C-alpha cells in the first residue's frame, strides 16, 4: 500500500464516520508565536480546543505537513543517520471538539489499523498514562487487548502537550512490533526500549486541560481528542520495511539523487547518509519556501538556511560541484504534488530560491576553506595539532561547515579537532537561541486581552460604512491591567462595544482620531485588533476623567483614513500591474499601508529595470484614470477562490470572507478600508524598488497629494541643478554631460601629470635605497594628499627597482598611511602582509594584504619615521 493510498484510505474512513476533511495549515503557525513551525496536526485547531474559535464541525481529520528543526522539537542532527528522524513529515490525525472522547477514539484507531489496514493484532501494543485506568479498561474490555500488552508510563511518555503552554492531557500510544531481528537482542527488550523493535505508530491525546505560563492546569471547556499518526511510519509497516527512507514516500527522491549523482544507494554508508539527508531536507526546503519562508539570518529563515546548507554540503560530498538541490524539487513534487497542489503552482519560484541560496553557499564554502587553511598553517607554526573548538564552531555557524567535513580536511594535515570544545560552543548557542526566541518580542496575545475576550467582551466594527459611532466603554486598560477610570495625562487602552476605528491588521495601520465622553476627551494614537472581534484603542486622556461604562462619541480622523484608503487600494492595483509586467509568479510577501505611503513586498528574482517600473506605474495610473468602482462583497471562502480572487498565500481565512474588487482588474480577499472609486487615488508614483531577501523585492510608492508633492520636489531639485550649472531653459542635461566630459578630460591630464611626477619621484627615492642581507630595501616618507596614490608610486618604484622591498608612507588628513610592496621574485621569502603587521602597531593601527602588496593606516602620524626606519630591521 503506497503512502498516497494510506492517506486516501484514512480520509475515507473518517469521512464515513462524520469527520470533515480539513486542509493542512501553513508551516508558519498562525497567531501562535510560541511555535517556530507547525509541528503537529492539532496546531491549527489550538483555538478550537481553547474555546476561542468555533468551527462548523465538531469532528475533523487532516494530513498535516509538519517541520521539526528548531526549538523544543529539533531532529536536524539525527536526520539521515537513523531510520525515522525527519525535518519534514506528514501527520495523519482525527480530532473531536467536545464530541466523542476516549471510548470512540480508541475504537476508531483500533478499527482502522486492524480492519482497514488489516494489521496483525498480535504485533500491536498500547501504552497509557500511569493513572489513566479508564483508557486501560477500554483497551482491555472494549477492544480485547490483553493486559500484558498494555503498558503504563509516566508524564514524560504519556502526557502530551504542544509546547510550554497550551492544550494538553493524557495520551495512549499504539506500537508496532518490527520483530526481534530489528531490536537490541536483550531478553528484557519491551515497549519503551530505545531500540528499533517497538515503533510508535499512533498517538491518541485526550485533551482535558490547558497549561498556562505558570504550569497550572485548568479544564478545557469540553474534553476533546487529538490524534497523530506519522504517514512515513505507518508506510513502513504497510510496505514491510524498517526504515522510513525505504518507503515509496522517500525512495522516489533517493532514486532521483542516484540518477543525478551517478552513485548507488546501499553501496557506501557515507553516501547513503548523504542521500537520506538530501531526500529528507529537500522535502522540508520545498515546503518551507512554498509556504512563504525564505532563507535569512534570523528566526524561521535561519533554520531554513541551516537545512539548505546541510543538504548542500551533503550534495558536495556526493560529488556535486554545482548547485544541485533545486533539481531535486521535481522529484519532491512528483511525489507530493497531488496532495499539495500549491507545490506545482510555485515550482519555478521554489527552484529559483533554492538555486540562489546554493550559489551563495558555494561562495561561502570557499571562503570558509580559506580561513581553515590559514588556521592550520598558524597552528603548525605553533607546533600544535588540534584545531580549537571555537574555530570549528565559527566554521560551522558562520560558514556552514559541518564538523565531519572540517575533520576530514584537517586529517590530511595530521590534525585532529577539539570535539568537546565544539560541543560546548554548540550548547552555548542552543541556550542563547532558546533565550532569544523567548524574548524576541513575539510573545502571545497579552493575557489581559484573553481575559477580556473570555468574559465575552466584543467590539462590533462599523467602520466600512461609518466614521463616527456612539458607543459605550466596556473596559479601560493601563499598563496591561484593567482599571475603573483614567485621568488626564494617562496613556490607556480603551475597549468599546461599537467602533468605527479600523484595528491594524493585514498590513494596514490602525485608525487614529478622538473619543469623547461627557467628562473626558481622548486622542486615539493607534488602534489594534488582538482578536478578530475585539478592537483596542490606544489613547491619551487629554482632559477630564474617563470611566468604564461611560457613553462615548467616537470619531475617526477622516483625512488620515482617506489617505490610508488611497494607499491600500493602490496596493491592490500595484499587485495586478506587477503580475502583468513581470508574470504570474509574483506573489505578495508582505505589505505596509499607512496614510503617508505604501510598501509592497513581492516574489521576484531580479531588480526591476527602469522600463519595467515605468510600465507598472503607467498601468496603475491608467487604472486610476479609468475610475472603476471599488466594491466589497462578502461570500463563502470557496466561492471567492473559485472566482479567482487573490488570497495571501498561507493566510488562514474563515468560512466567510470579504472580497474587494476594483472594476475588472483586481479582486482580492481583504479586510481593509478602501476608496469608493479608483479615481479617488488621484495619482500614483513609485519612489523606490529594492531587494530585501533572496527572491523578494520591495516597492515603495506614494499616492494623491503625497505623490504630487514628491514630483514637485523633484522639479525643484531639477531647477536648482539648472541654476548651479548655469543652464538655459531645458538644456541642463546637455550642460551636465559637457561638464562630466570635461571632468574626465581633466582627470586624464591629472593622471598623466601624476605619472610623470611619480617617475621623477622614483628616481630621487631610489637613490636612498639600502641593501640589507642582499636585499634592496627602500623605506621613505613622501608628501601626498591622497593615500591612494601610494599604490601607483609603489608600482613605479617596483618597475625601476626590479628586485627588492618598498616601504613608503605619507600623512593624510591627520592619519599615517603605510604601504609595503615586495617584488615577485622575493614574495616566497618575504610576505608584504607579514611586514605590514609588524609595522602597523608603531603608527597606532592595523593592516593586511597579499604577499606582494599590503597597506595599513594609523592614528599616530608622528611615529611614521620610526616605522619606516624599523622596516630595515624587520627585513634584515
From Swiss-Prot:
The name this protein goes by in its record: Alanine--tRNA ligase
Gene3D superfamilies, per the entry: 2.40.30.130, 3.10.310.40, 3.30.54.20, 6.10.250.550, Bira Bifunctional Protein, Domain 2 (3.30.930.10), Threonyl-trna Synthetase, Chain A, domain 2 (3.30.980.10)
Keyword flag Ubl conjugation: no
Textual note on the cofactor: Binds 1 zinc ion per subunit.
Binding site for Zn(2+): 568, 572, 670, 674
Gene Ontology CC terms: cytosol
Catalysis performed (reactions): tRNA(Ala) + L-alanine + ATP = L-alanyl-tRNA(Ala) + AMP + diphosphate
A Pfam family hit: tRNA_SAD
CC cofactor: Zn(2+)
Nucleotide-binding keyword on record: yes
Compartment list: Cytoplasm
Comment, domains: Consists of three domains; the N-terminal catalytic domain, the editing domain and the C-terminal C-Ala domain. The editing domain removes incorrectly charged amino acids, while the C-Ala domain, along with tRNA(Ala), serves as a bridge to cooperatively bring together the editing and aminoacylation centers thus stimulating deacylation of misacylated tRNAs.
SMART domains associated with the record: tRNA_SAD (SM00863)
Amino acid at each position: 500500500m503506497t503512502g498516497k493510498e494510506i492517506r486516501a484510505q484514512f480520509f475515507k474512513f473518517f469521512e464515513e464516520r462524520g469527520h470533515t476533511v480539513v486542509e493542512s495549515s501553513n508551516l508558519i503557525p498562525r497567531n501562535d508565536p510560541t511555535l517556530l513551525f507547525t509541528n503537529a496536526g492539532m496546531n491549527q485547531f489550538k483555538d478550537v480546543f481553547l474555546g476561542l474559535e468555533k468551527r462548523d464541525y465538531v469532528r475533523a481529520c487532516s494530513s498535516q505537513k509538519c517541520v521539526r528543526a528548531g526549538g523544543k522539537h529539533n531532529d536536524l542532527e539525527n536526520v539521515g543517520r537513523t531510520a525515522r528522524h525527519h525535518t519534514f513529515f506528514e501527520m495523519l490525525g482525527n480530532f473531536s471538539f467536545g464530541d466523542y472522547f476516549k471510548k470512540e477514539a480508541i475504537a476508531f484507531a483500533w478499527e482502522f489499523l486492524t480492519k482497514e489496514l488489516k494489521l496483525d493484532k498480535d504485533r500491536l501494543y498500547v501504552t497509557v498514562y500511569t493513572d489513566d485506568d479508564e483508557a486501560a479498561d477500554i483497551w482491555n474490555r472494549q477492544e480485547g487487548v490483553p493486559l500484558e500488552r498494555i503498558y503504563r508510563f509516566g508524564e514524560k511518555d504519556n502526557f502530551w502537550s504542544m509546547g510550554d503552554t497550551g492544550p494538553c492531557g493524557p495520551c495512549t500510544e499504539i506500537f508496532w512490533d518490527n520483530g526481534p531481528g530489528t531490536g537490541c537482542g536483550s531478553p528484557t527488550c519491551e515497549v519503551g526500549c530505545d531500540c528499533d523493535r517497538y515503533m510508535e505508530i499512533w498517538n491518541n491525546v485526550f485533551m482535558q486541560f490547558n497549561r498556562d505560563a505558570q504550569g497550572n492546569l485548568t479544564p478545557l471547556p469540553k474534553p476533546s481528542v487529538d490524534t497523530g499518526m506519522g504517514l512515513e511510519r505507518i508506510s513502513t509497516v504497510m510496505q514491510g520495511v524498517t526504515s522510513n527512507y525505504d518507503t515509496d514516500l522517500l525512495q522516489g527522491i533517493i532514486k532521483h539523487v542516484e540518477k543525478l549523482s551517478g552513485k548507488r544507494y546501499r553501496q557506501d554508508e557515507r553516501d547513503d547518509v548523504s542521500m537520506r539527508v538530501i531526500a529528507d531536507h529537500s522535502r522540508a526546503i520545498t515546503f518551507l519556501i512554498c509556504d512563504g519562508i525564505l532563507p535569512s539570518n534570523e528566526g524561521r529563515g535561519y533554520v531554513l538556511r541551516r537545512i539548505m546548507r546541510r543538504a548542500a554540503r551533503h550534495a558536495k560530498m556526493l560529488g556535486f560541484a554545482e548547485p544541485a538541490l533545486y533539481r531535486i524539487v521535481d522529484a519532491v513534487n512528483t511525489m507530493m504534488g497531488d496532495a499539495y497542489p500549491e507545490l506545482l503552482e510555485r515550482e519555478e519560484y521554489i527552484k529559483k530560491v533554492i538555486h540562489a541560496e546554493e550559489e551563495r553557499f558555494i561562495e561561502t564554502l570557499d571562503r570558509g576553506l580559506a580561513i581553515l587553511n590559514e588556521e592550520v598553517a598558524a597552528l603548525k607554526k605553533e607546533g600544535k595539532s588540534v584545531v580549537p573548538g571555537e574555530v570549528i564552531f565559527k566554521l560551522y555557524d558562520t560558514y556552514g561547515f559541518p564538523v565531519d567535513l572540517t575533520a576530514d580536511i584537517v586529517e590530511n594535515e595530521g590534525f585532529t579537532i577539539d570535539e568537546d570544545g565544539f560541543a560546548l560552543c554548540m550548547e552555548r548557542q542552543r541556550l542563547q537561541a532558546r533565550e532569544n526566541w523567548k524574548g524576541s518580542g513575539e510573545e502571545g496575545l497579552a493575557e489581559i486581552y484573553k481575559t477580556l475576550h473570555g468574559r465575552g467582551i466584543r467590539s462590533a466594527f462599523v467602520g466600512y460604512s461609518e466614521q463616527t459611532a456612539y458607543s459605550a466603554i466596556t473596559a479601560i486598560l493601563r499598563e496591561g491591567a484593567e482599571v475603573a477610570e483614567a485621568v488626564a495625562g494617562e496613556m490607556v487602552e480603551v475597549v468599546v462595544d461599537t467602533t468605527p476605528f479600523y484595528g491594524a491588521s493585514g498590513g494596514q495601520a490602525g485608525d487614529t482620531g478622538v473619543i469623547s465622553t461627557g467628562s473626558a476627551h481622548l486622542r486615539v494614537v493607534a488602534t489594534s485588533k488582538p482578536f478578530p472581534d475585539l478592537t483596542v484603542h490606544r489613547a491619551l486622556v487629554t482632559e477630564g476623567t474617563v470611566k468604564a461604562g461611560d457613553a462615548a462619541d467616537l470619531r475617526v480622523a477622516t483625512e488620515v483614513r482617506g489617505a490610508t484608503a488611497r494607499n491600500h487600494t493602490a496596493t491592490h492595483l500595484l499587485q495586478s500591474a506587477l503580475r502583468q509586467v513581470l508574470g504570474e509568479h509574483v506573489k505578495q510577501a508582505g505589505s505596509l499601508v499607512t496614510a503617508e505611503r505604501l510598501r509592497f513586498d513581492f516574489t521576484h528574482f531580479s531588480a526591476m529595470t527602469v522600463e519595467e517600473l515605468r510600465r507598472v506605474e503607467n498601468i496603475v495610473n491608467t487604472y486610476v484614470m479609468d475610475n472603476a468602482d471599488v466594491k466589497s462583497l462578502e461570500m463563502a471562502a470557496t466561492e471567492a477562490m473559485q472566482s479567482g480572487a487573490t488570497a495571501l498565500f498561507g493566510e488562514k481565512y474563515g468560512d466567510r470572507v470579504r472580497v474587494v474588487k476594483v472594476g475588472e482588474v483586481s479582486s482580492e480577499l481583504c479586510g481593509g478600508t478602501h476608496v469608493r472609486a479608483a479615481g479617488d487615488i488621484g495619482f500614483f508614483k513609485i519612489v523606490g524598488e529594492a531587494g530585501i531577501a533572496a527572491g523578494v523585492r520591495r516597492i515603495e510608492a506614494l499616492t494623491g497629494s503625497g505623490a504630487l508633492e514628491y514630483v514637485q520636489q523633484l522639479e525643484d531639485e531639477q531647477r536648482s541643478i539648472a541654476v548651479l550649472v548655469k543652464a538655459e531653459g531645458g538644456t541642463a542635461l546637455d550642460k551636465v554631460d559637457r561638464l562630466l566630459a570635461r571632468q574626465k578630460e581633466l582627470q586624464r591630464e591629472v593622471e598623466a601629470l601624476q605619472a610623470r611626477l611619480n617617475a621623477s619621484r622614483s628616481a630621487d627615492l631610489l637613490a636612498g635605497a639600502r641593501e640589507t642581507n642582499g636585499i634592496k630595501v627602500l623605506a621613505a616618507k613622501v608628501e601626498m594628499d591622497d593615500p591612494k596614490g601610494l599604490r601607483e608610486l609603489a608600482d613605479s618604484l617596483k618597475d625601476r627597482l626590479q628586485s627588492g622591498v618598498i616601504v613608503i608612507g605619507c600623512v593624510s588628513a591627520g592619519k599615517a598611511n603605510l604601504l609595503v610592496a615586495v617584488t615577485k621574485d622575493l614574495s616566497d621569502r618575504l610576505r608584504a602582509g607579514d611586514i605590514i603587521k609588524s609595522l602597523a602597531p608603531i603608527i597606532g593601527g592595523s593592516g593586511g594584504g597579499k604577499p606582494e602588496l599590503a597597506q595599513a593606516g594609523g592614528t599616530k602620524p608622528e611615529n611614521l619615521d620610526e616605522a619606516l626606519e624599523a622596516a630595515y630591521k624587520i627585513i634584515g
